[in-house]
Amino acid sequence: MGGIRPRVDTRSKILTLAAALELRPPVAIVSGYFDVLRAEDARELGRVRHHPLLVVVLPVADEILPPLARAEMVAALRVVDYVVIANYGGLDRLVEALKPVEYTRMEGEHAVRRDRWHQQLMEHVDRRHIN
């Protein structure tokens, strides 16, 4: 059995937009809402792990978790090197400045999945209140 690993404060992976714009290529960028972070997200982020990985947490209407909480959860994943909370304008600036070797947008998938998850959650709550 290995020794005890030191705790790492993964919040240090969370950068300001200005700091993220100073990153050196090559870098991969993945953007999304990550509200709620799911296993599929972790698998997708692991798939693009061939270069330093910058994840951009975007705003979403009717959020379940605030942006900082979502950024902290994403930063806790071992495959993620950096996280930035940004709006779409900030995302565009990052893509233009960093010219990522890989760029994956997950927000469309997140929106569909979030709506489905929200519906399932509401149905579950309704069933629990009936019984």
Model-based region annotation:
Residues 1-131:
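Nucleotidyltransferase catalytic core that binds NTPs
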